[in-house]
């Protein structure tokens, strides 16, 4: 489903002032309650919008996972500017995440799940890599018409996302972030 994939040529919008205002990284990752001992996976890490501040919040590794090598190269450049050495770069799709079972305490996945071809399979993969007691934070576009973002027919409504998570063995809490939403979820 390449028609849904983010175009790396538009990577500059991922670090824009508008995005910083709508999705302030520190406020958003605050929902993950990151501890310095947490190992984190940022799925669909892009150029590091969340991976970099998360790496600054933990003494352990942040696995920056992205299917697009160009995005990982940009992320590495951004992390090098911040002199971060605790980011591991993983080129992988999300229906078979190239991380070990039970390898992370937290998972961040921002504005990506609407792109995956099989949501249930991806949620199963996330469950596989999460340690017992770990949690995930999902950020997605609400299924409303907006000037930017993916087409309405690609978006997943917050209620549908919560139901899908519950069906896949997670407890889910929806947090409205107009025009986005967050879902904090833990494995049941």
Give the residues covered by each predicted segment.
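A short glycine-rich, Lys/Arg-flanked "PGG" loop and its adjoining helix->strand segment in the class I
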Residues: 120-132
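A short SAM/SAH-binding and catalytic strip from SAM-dependent methyltransferases
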Residues: 105-118
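Conserved SAM-binding loop and adjacent beta-strand
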Residues: 10-28
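Conserved Class I S-adenosyl-L-methionine
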Residues: 150-168
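Class I SAM-dependent methyltransferase SAM/SAH-binding core
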Residues: 41, 47-96
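Conserved beta-strand signature within the Rossmann-like core of class I S-adenosyl-L-methionine
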Residues: 133-140
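Core SAM-dependent methyltransferase catalytic element
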Residues: 170, 174-188
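A short acidic, Gly/Pro-enriched loop at the edge of an enzyme's catalytic core
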Residues: 95-106
